[in-house]
Amino acid sequence: MIPTLKAEFKKLLTVRSTYFITGLVTAFVIFITLYVIGWRMNIHDLHDPAQLADAATGALTMSVFGAIVAVLLMTHEYRYNTIMHTLTSSNSRSKVLFSKFIVASVYALFLAALIGILSPTMVYLGVHLHGHMLVPQTLHYGNLAWRVLFYGWGFGMAGLLLAVLSRNQIASIVGLFVIPDVIEQLFGLLLKHNTVYLPFSSLNQVIGNSGGRTDTSSNLSPSKAAGVYCIYLVVGWIIGWYLFLYRDATKLD
Protein backbone atom coordinates (compact mmCIF):
# COMPACT_ATOMS: atom_id res chain seq x y z
CA MET A 1 0.00 0.00 0.00
CA ILE A 2 2.79 2.45 0.93
CA PRO A 3 4.66 2.07 -2.41
CA THR A 4 1.41 2.60 -4.31
CA LEU A 5 0.60 5.67 -2.24
CA LYS A 6 4.08 7.10 -2.80
CA ALA A 7 3.73 6.52 -6.53
CA GLU A 8 0.44 8.43 -6.62
CA PHE A 9 1.88 11.37 -4.67
CA LYS A 10 4.80 11.40 -7.09
CA LYS A 11 2.38 11.59 -10.02
CA LEU A 12 0.57 14.51 -8.41
CA LEU A 13 3.75 16.42 -7.62
CA THR A 14 5.55 15.87 -10.93
CA VAL A 15 2.75 17.03 -13.22
CA ARG A 16 2.98 20.69 -14.23
CA SER A 17 -0.80 21.11 -14.26
CA THR A 18 -0.85 20.67 -10.45
CA TYR A 19 1.37 23.71 -9.96
CA PHE A 20 -0.27 25.71 -12.73
CA ILE A 21 -3.76 25.19 -11.30
CA THR A 22 -2.62 25.90 -7.74
CA GLY A 23 -0.88 29.10 -8.85
CA LEU A 24 -3.86 30.19 -10.94
CA VAL A 25 -6.30 29.67 -8.07
CA THR A 26 -4.01 31.50 -5.64
CA ALA A 27 -3.55 34.48 -7.97
CA PHE A 28 -7.26 34.72 -8.73
CA VAL A 29 -8.29 34.49 -5.07
CA ILE A 30 -5.76 37.18 -4.11
CA PHE A 31 -6.98 39.52 -6.86
CA ILE A 32 -10.67 39.06 -6.10
CA THR A 33 -10.43 39.23 -2.32
CA LEU A 34 -7.68 41.85 -1.98
CA TYR A 35 -8.84 44.29 -4.65
CA VAL A 36 -12.40 43.57 -5.78
CA ILE A 37 -13.80 42.77 -2.31
CA GLY A 38 -11.35 44.34 0.16
CA TRP A 39 -10.04 47.49 -1.52
CA ARG A 40 -13.36 48.37 -3.16
CA MET A 41 -15.60 47.48 -0.21
CA ASN A 42 -18.34 50.04 0.36
CA ILE A 43 -18.94 51.75 3.69
CA HIS A 44 -22.07 49.73 4.45
CA ASP A 45 -20.24 46.39 4.16
CA LEU A 46 -17.54 47.60 6.55
CA HIS A 47 -20.14 47.31 9.32
CA ASP A 48 -20.95 43.66 8.58
CA PRO A 49 -19.51 41.46 11.38
CA ALA A 50 -19.68 38.40 9.10
CA GLN A 51 -17.65 39.91 6.27
CA LEU A 52 -14.51 37.81 6.80
CA ALA A 53 -16.47 34.60 7.37
CA ASP A 54 -18.38 35.22 4.14
CA ALA A 55 -15.09 35.82 2.34
CA ALA A 56 -13.75 32.47 3.55
CA THR A 57 -16.72 30.55 2.16
CA GLY A 58 -17.50 32.74 -0.84
CA ALA A 59 -14.23 32.06 -2.63
CA LEU A 60 -14.67 28.29 -2.24
CA THR A 61 -16.28 28.07 -5.67
CA MET A 62 -12.65 27.89 -6.80
CA SER A 63 -12.57 24.41 -5.23
CA VAL A 64 -13.77 23.14 -8.59
CA PHE A 65 -10.12 23.39 -9.64
CA GLY A 66 -9.19 20.97 -6.88
CA ALA A 67 -11.70 18.60 -8.44
CA ILE A 68 -10.06 19.14 -11.84
CA VAL A 69 -6.69 18.11 -10.38
CA ALA A 70 -8.38 14.95 -9.06
CA VAL A 71 -9.80 14.32 -12.53
CA LEU A 72 -6.37 14.69 -14.11
CA LEU A 73 -4.83 12.33 -11.54
CA MET A 74 -7.14 9.57 -12.76
CA THR A 75 -7.75 10.33 -16.44
CA HIS A 76 -4.09 10.94 -17.33
CA GLU A 77 -3.71 7.20 -16.77
CA TYR A 78 -6.14 6.46 -19.59
CA ARG A 79 -5.17 9.35 -21.84
CA TYR A 80 -1.48 8.41 -21.85
CA ASN A 81 -2.12 4.67 -21.57
CA THR A 82 -0.26 4.22 -18.28
CA ILE A 83 -3.16 2.53 -16.50
CA MET A 84 -1.87 -0.96 -17.33
CA HIS A 85 1.49 -0.21 -15.72
CA THR A 86 -0.21 1.31 -12.66
CA LEU A 87 -2.46 -1.70 -12.15
CA THR A 88 0.22 -4.34 -12.72
CA SER A 89 2.68 -2.57 -10.40
CA SER A 90 0.32 -3.22 -7.48
CA ASN A 91 -1.11 -6.51 -6.25
CA SER A 92 -4.57 -4.98 -5.78
CA ARG A 93 -6.76 -2.67 -7.82
CA SER A 94 -8.41 -1.56 -4.61
CA LYS A 95 -5.05 -0.31 -3.33
CA VAL A 96 -4.57 1.73 -6.50
CA LEU A 97 -8.00 3.31 -6.23
CA PHE A 98 -7.68 3.93 -2.50
CA SER A 99 -4.28 5.55 -3.04
CA LYS A 100 -5.73 7.90 -5.62
CA PHE A 101 -8.59 8.65 -3.23
CA ILE A 102 -6.14 9.58 -0.46
CA VAL A 103 -3.91 11.71 -2.72
CA ALA A 104 -6.88 13.55 -4.23
CA SER A 105 -8.30 14.09 -0.73
CA VAL A 106 -5.03 15.56 0.55
CA TYR A 107 -4.80 17.98 -2.36
CA ALA A 108 -8.48 18.98 -2.12
CA LEU A 109 -8.12 19.66 1.62
CA PHE A 110 -4.91 21.62 1.02
CA LEU A 111 -6.54 23.80 -1.64
CA ALA A 112 -9.66 24.39 0.49
CA ALA A 113 -7.50 25.37 3.47
CA LEU A 114 -5.43 27.68 1.27
CA ILE A 115 -8.55 29.41 -0.06
CA GLY A 116 -10.21 29.52 3.36
CA ILE A 117 -7.20 31.18 4.99
CA LEU A 118 -6.12 33.39 2.10
CA SER A 119 -9.55 34.88 1.35
CA PRO A 120 -10.34 36.60 4.68
CA THR A 121 -6.69 37.58 5.12
CA MET A 122 -6.61 39.35 1.76
CA VAL A 123 -9.98 41.02 2.37
CA TYR A 124 -8.72 42.34 5.70
CA LEU A 125 -5.49 43.55 4.08
CA GLY A 126 -7.34 45.20 1.18
CA VAL A 127 -9.64 47.10 3.53
CA HIS A 128 -6.73 48.39 5.61
CA LEU A 129 -4.60 49.32 2.60
CA HIS A 130 -7.49 51.52 1.49
CA GLY A 131 -7.49 53.24 4.87
CA HIS A 132 -10.69 51.73 6.22
CA MET A 133 -11.43 49.45 9.15
CA LEU A 134 -13.87 46.59 9.60
CA VAL A 135 -16.09 46.34 12.64
CA PRO A 136 -15.14 43.50 15.07
CA GLN A 137 -15.71 40.25 13.18
CA THR A 138 -17.62 37.18 14.32
CA LEU A 139 -15.58 34.12 13.40
CA HIS A 140 -16.56 30.70 14.74
CA TYR A 141 -13.30 29.05 13.77
CA GLY A 142 -14.24 25.43 14.38
CA ASN A 143 -17.56 25.65 12.56
CA LEU A 144 -16.02 27.59 9.70
CA ALA A 145 -13.04 25.26 9.36
CA TRP A 146 -15.00 22.02 9.01
CA ARG A 147 -17.41 23.54 6.48
CA VAL A 148 -14.58 24.98 4.38
CA LEU A 149 -12.63 21.71 4.41
CA PHE A 150 -15.68 19.54 3.78
CA TYR A 151 -16.76 21.64 0.80
CA GLY A 152 -13.33 21.49 -0.81
CA TRP A 153 -12.95 17.78 -0.11
CA GLY A 154 -16.48 17.05 -1.32
CA PHE A 155 -15.89 18.76 -4.65
CA GLY A 156 -12.59 16.93 -5.08
CA MET A 157 -14.19 13.56 -4.44
CA ALA A 158 -16.96 14.34 -6.91
CA GLY A 159 -14.34 15.07 -9.56
CA LEU A 160 -12.42 11.87 -8.88
CA LEU A 161 -15.64 9.85 -8.90
CA LEU A 162 -16.67 11.28 -12.28
CA ALA A 163 -13.23 10.35 -13.61
CA VAL A 164 -13.52 6.79 -12.27
CA LEU A 165 -16.96 6.36 -13.82
CA SER A 166 -16.27 7.94 -17.21
CA ARG A 167 -12.50 7.38 -17.62
CA ASN A 168 -12.65 10.39 -19.92
CA GLN A 169 -10.92 13.67 -19.10
CA ILE A 170 -13.16 16.02 -21.07
CA ALA A 171 -16.40 14.34 -19.98
CA SER A 172 -15.38 14.48 -16.31
CA ILE A 173 -14.41 18.16 -16.40
CA VAL A 174 -17.54 19.12 -18.33
CA GLY A 175 -19.60 17.15 -15.80
CA LEU A 176 -18.17 19.21 -12.93
CA PHE A 177 -19.70 22.33 -14.46
CA VAL A 178 -22.79 20.97 -16.22
CA ILE A 179 -24.19 18.82 -13.39
CA PRO A 180 -24.44 21.55 -10.71
CA ASP A 181 -25.11 24.51 -13.02
CA VAL A 182 -27.42 22.96 -15.62
CA ILE A 183 -28.73 19.51 -14.75
CA GLU A 184 -29.52 20.22 -11.10
CA GLN A 185 -31.11 23.53 -12.07
CA LEU A 186 -33.42 21.69 -14.48
CA PHE A 187 -34.28 19.10 -11.83
CA GLY A 188 -35.02 22.00 -9.53
CA LEU A 189 -37.92 23.01 -11.77
CA LEU A 190 -39.52 19.64 -11.03
CA LEU A 191 -38.47 19.06 -7.44
CA LYS A 192 -39.15 22.59 -6.15
CA HIS A 193 -38.25 22.67 -2.44
CA ASN A 194 -36.76 19.17 -2.60
CA THR A 195 -33.96 20.58 -4.76
CA VAL A 196 -32.02 20.94 -1.51
CA TYR A 197 -31.51 17.16 -1.52
CA LEU A 198 -29.68 17.07 -4.86
CA PRO A 199 -25.93 16.35 -4.62
CA PHE A 200 -24.31 19.69 -5.39
CA SER A 201 -27.22 21.63 -3.93
CA SER A 202 -26.65 19.89 -0.60
CA LEU A 203 -22.90 20.52 -0.87
CA ASN A 204 -23.51 24.23 -1.46
CA GLN A 205 -25.63 24.41 1.68
CA VAL A 206 -22.69 23.26 3.78
CA ILE A 207 -21.18 26.71 3.25
CA GLY A 208 -24.54 28.52 3.25
CA ASN A 209 -24.79 28.91 -0.52
CA SER A 210 -28.38 28.66 -1.78
CA GLY A 211 -27.24 27.92 -5.33
CA GLY A 212 -29.24 30.78 -6.79
CA ARG A 213 -32.53 29.82 -5.13
CA THR A 214 -34.55 32.76 -3.86
CA ASP A 215 -36.53 30.69 -1.35
CA THR A 216 -34.07 29.61 1.33
CA SER A 217 -36.67 28.64 3.93
CA SER A 218 -36.24 24.94 3.09
CA ASN A 219 -32.45 25.00 3.34
CA LEU A 220 -30.79 22.18 5.25
CA SER A 221 -28.47 22.83 8.17
CA PRO A 222 -24.75 22.50 7.27
CA SER A 223 -24.40 19.19 9.14
CA LYS A 224 -27.53 17.68 7.57
CA ALA A 225 -26.49 18.89 4.13
CA ALA A 226 -23.08 17.26 4.64
CA GLY A 227 -24.81 14.01 5.60
CA VAL A 228 -26.98 14.07 2.47
CA TYR A 229 -23.95 14.69 0.28
CA CYS A 230 -22.02 11.87 1.96
CA ILE A 231 -24.82 9.45 1.10
CA TYR A 232 -24.40 10.33 -2.58
CA LEU A 233 -20.64 9.90 -2.30
CA VAL A 234 -20.91 6.51 -0.59
CA VAL A 235 -23.33 5.15 -3.20
CA GLY A 236 -21.33 6.64 -6.05
CA TRP A 237 -18.04 5.29 -4.76
CA ILE A 238 -19.44 1.79 -4.25
CA ILE A 239 -20.41 1.80 -7.93
CA GLY A 240 -17.11 3.38 -8.96
CA TRP A 241 -15.10 0.88 -6.91
CA TYR A 242 -16.96 -2.06 -8.45
CA LEU A 243 -16.40 -0.77 -11.97
CA PHE A 244 -12.73 -0.07 -11.29
CA LEU A 245 -12.25 -3.62 -10.01
CA TYR A 246 -13.98 -5.48 -12.81
CA ARG A 247 -14.11 -3.26 -15.90
CA ASP A 248 -11.52 -4.47 -18.43
CA ALA A 249 -10.16 -6.85 -15.78
CA THR A 250 -9.22 -9.61 -18.22
CA LYS A 251 -7.71 -7.10 -20.61
CA LEU A 252 -5.51 -5.21 -18.15
CA ASP A 253 -4.68 -7.77 -15.47
PLM region spans:
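A short amphipathic helical element positioned immediately N-terminal to and/or at the very start
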Residues: I2-L13
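Binding-cleft/active-site segments that stabilize strongly anionic ligands or cofactors
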Residues: V174-G175, L190
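Junction motif at the cytosolic side of a transmembrane helix
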Residues: C230-D253
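Helix-capping/transition residues at the boundaries of transmembrane alpha-helices
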Residues: K11, T75, T86-T88, G159, ...
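Secretory targeting signals
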Residues: S17-L73, L97-R167, F177-V178, E184-Q185, ...
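Transmembrane helix boundary and interhelical loop/hinge segments in multi-pass membrane proteins
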Residues: A70-S89, R93-S94
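Transmembrane helix-loop junctions and nearby membrane-interface residues
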Residues: T33-R40, M74, L189-K192, G240, ...
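Short hydrophobic, aromatic-rich alpha-helical segments embedded in or entering the lipid bilayer
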Residues: P3-T4, K192-R213
